[in-house]
């Protein structure tokens, strides 16, 4: 009688361990998503830098919050929180392609960080310009990618 319960318990334990253990494919998938995010952020930065609208140059001086320390995937919560205000600032100045790019960035960030929202961002006292903000998140992606290789 107890033997069946013990076998069931062992089977359940093995199933839990197998499903929660990180696999190389999930690591590879995370790397690919980070590379995609990095590329999209670079394209957004390029779109911002190459825009000739004189009003946009004023908007580029607006400051955006950066987390005190962005070193883990959970810190993407901070990027997600700042993307909406960034999109609102840029929406009238950038092409439809850039707006789609912002949407892609949002989707990739959600995929990387998951639906977990319990993490609360601690923002630095100093804010960043839009260009600095994008550059720091591009660097963040590269840093995480390098730890996964």
Swiss-Prot record:
**Which N-terminal residues, if any, form the signal peptide?**
1-20
Q: Which Pfam families match?
A: IL2
Q: Which family does it belong to?
A: Belongs to the IL-2 family.
What's this protein's function? Cytokine produced by activated CD4-positive helper T-cells and to a lesser extend activated CD8-positive T-cells and natural killer (NK) cells that plays pivotal roles in the immune response and tolerance. Binds to a receptor complex composed of either the high-affinity trimeric IL-2R (IL2RA/CD25, IL2RB/CD122 and IL2RG/CD132) or the low-affinity dimeric IL-2R (IL2RB and IL2RG). Interaction with the receptor leads to oligomerization and conformation changes in the IL-2R subunits resulting in downstream signaling starting with phosphorylation of JAK1 and JAK3.
Molecular function GO labels: cytokine activity; growth factor activity; interleukin-2 receptor binding
Q: Cellular component terms, GO, for this chain's entry?
A: extracellular space
The glycosylation sites annotated in the UniProt record are 23, 106
Q: Which UniProt keywords apply?
A: Adaptive immunity, Cytokine, Disulfide bond, Glycoprotein, Growth factor, Immunity, Secreted, Signal
Asked if the record carries the keyword Secreted, the reply is yes
Query: Some GO term, biological process aspect, for this entry: which one?
Result: adaptive immune response
Instruction: Using the UniProt record, give the first listed, main subcellular location.
Output: secreted
* Naturally occurring in which organism (per UniProt): Equus caballus
Q: What's the protein name?
A: Interleukin-2
Tell me where in or outside the cell this protein is found: Secreted
What's the superkingdom here? Eukaryota
- Disulphide bonds annotated for this chain are 78-121
- InterPro entries membership: 4_helix_cytokine-like_core, IL-2, IL-2_CS
**Xref: PANTHER family:** INTERLEUKIN-2
């Amino acid at each position: 009688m107890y033997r069946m319960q013990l076998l069931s318990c062992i089977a359940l334990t093995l199933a839990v361990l197998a499903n929660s253990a990180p696999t190389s494919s999930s690591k590879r998938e995370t790397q690919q998503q980070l590379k995609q995010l990095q590329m999209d952020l670079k394209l957004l930065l390029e779109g911002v830098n190459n825009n000739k609208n004189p009003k946009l140059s004023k908007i580029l001086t607006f400051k955006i919050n950066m987390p005190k320390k962005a070193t883990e995937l959970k810190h993407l919560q901070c990027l997600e929180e700042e993307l909406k205000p960034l999109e609102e600032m840029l929406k009238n100045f950038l092409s439809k392609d850039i707006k789609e790019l912002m949407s892609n960035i949002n989707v990739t960030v959600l995929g990387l960080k998951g639906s977990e929202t319990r993490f609360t961002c601690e923002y630095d006292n100093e804010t960043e310009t839009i260009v600095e903000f994008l550059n720091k998140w591009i660097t963040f992606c590269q840093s995480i990618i390098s730890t996964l290789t």
